[in-house]
Amino acid sequence: MQIVVLFDILKRILMEEEKKSLNFIEQIIEDDLANGLKREQIRFRFPPEPNGYLHVGHTKAICINFGLGEKYNAPVNLRFDDTNPEKEEQEFVDSIMKDVEWLGFKWDKVLYASDYFQQLYDWAVQLIKEGKAYVDEQPSEVITEQRKNPTEPGIESPFRNRPVEESLDLFERMKNGEFEEGSMSLRAKIDMVSPNMNMRDPVMYRILKRPHHRTGTTWKIYPMYDWAHGESDYIEQISHSLCSLEFENHRPLYNWYLDQVYEEGRVKNKQREFARMNVSYMITSKRKLQRLIAENVVNGWDDPRMPTISGMRRKGYTPASIRNFIDKVGVAKRENLIEIQLLDFCVREDLNKVAKRVMAVVDPIKLVIENYPEGQEEWLETENNPEQENAGTRQIPFSRELYIEREDFKEEAGNKFFRLKLGGEVRLKSAYIIKGERVEKDENGEITTIYATYDEKSKSGSGTEESLRKVKGTIHWVSAKHAIPVEVRNYEKLFTVEQPDAEKDVDFLNFINPESISTIQGFGEPGLKDVAVGEPLQFQRIGYFTKDQDSTDTNYVFNRTVTLKDSYKPE
């Protein structure tokens, strides 16, 4: 009996702990399940508008919706809210699909709001017949003026109570293209004194004589976002419509529209909002991102300094690192500023696990091993990734003349300098122990060549007594004879302040970092020729890099993803 009681207590404790670990959206879903929603009725969607490239802010919505789909084994639709033909293009549809797939998620169906244009139109006609919508012939500026403000009641349109037959006739003629853009609109008849401005007879349709990327010139009128969005959710039977906090005030309108078409027995979708993700030193306004491109601050949507998913991918961020970042940020109800250092931390943490280790010298100086036979070369074995047991090894060439980093040598240095100096020893990574002997300088006194000797019995991994000898420093190198030239692009923050668009009266372009990119020429081991574009790499002792799409057979370009180390630790 005692065992049963203890088991029940333990079970309750575990259930309470599980409940505490749920975020507020998961708790809403669990409550809905407890109140009769069937598990097989759970369905989500990610509904981007195809008018630009996805950015870091979208990754949160993607991860939340698809993550919930995985948690509840529920389908997630990728639905394009393509209701504005002025700004939407197939190029953006393709890039969005690529980004979602790259992040590691799979949708159930690809759908479009334009799939539902006829149904939305039919429902709008139904609302007109019921006296809940009317055609307004006033310009948009007048409509805006009549809405007033939250503390002042709005003014009703003189067309608000026109006969239903008139509105039906005009709406059909709007659809047929008989009227000019801006001359008429269809408005819902709700409440012109509501403190919620969205409820003051919102526009449902406007005239737009622009070709649509999917429907061509079939339609001359297009539904507004608020009308199309919730009804699309209803058509697809989305159980939980999740969006950012900016749409919280739109929820009453979302529900009002839904109430007009809802049929008993169907799933009644509910909108819930979560905090948007703002990351320091980044902007996500599409208009401002377009300005960066138009004014040649950056080189396109996939510039590695851009906060777009395509830019982050090109810079070398991994899908796992972004998903982990979103997981650490969590799902909150209040907006706050996320430190970019947390994103870098997640990227660095993942790259440490998966990046292949390679050798490259980004500020080269020649090193000649005087007692190594001229013309001789050998191939040495070195590990690909000590963090992965099955990563294996590779062969790298070694010869008499090498390149090392300029900062890895000093003619004279104290006891705390554990790199190469005259009279001092250092190990060449995966190779031999060498000793600095002398230098050669140009007419300006700059060192051009370092001369050293090597201990031929000290080869790494050979098992000799000399190879086991301990020296305090190990440096990387590349064989001068075999090295390939590499162009290294080091990226810094695009802006000099945490919130570049925080001040409304100051142009955000004033905060552009003039040193957001620097390009240097170096040398890399020959295997870098065959590295795939986008493959994560660690340039040993330097940082994490990836091969860029600008690479050619004669010019190998590598983007720095993040530095090797940082003092930042998440709280």
How would you name each of these model-derived features?
Residues 2-14:
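Short, Lys/Arg-enriched N-terminal segments with co-localized hydrophobic residues
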Residues 35-39, 67-75, 99-109, 234-235, ...:
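Secondary-structure transition/capping motifs at alpha-helix termini
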Residues 47-50, 79-87, 109-118, 141, ...:
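Conserved short loop/turn motifs at secondary-structure junctions
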Residues 82-84, 90, 112, 126-289, ...:
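Active-site cores that bind ATP or allylic diphosphates and position pyrophosphate for catalysis
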Residues 92-117, 124, 131-134:
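A glycine-rich helix N-cap at a beta->alpha junction
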Residues 267-346:
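Long, charged, mostly alpha-helical binding arms that flank functional sites
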Residues 325-333, 337-571:
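Substrate/cofactor-recognition hotspot
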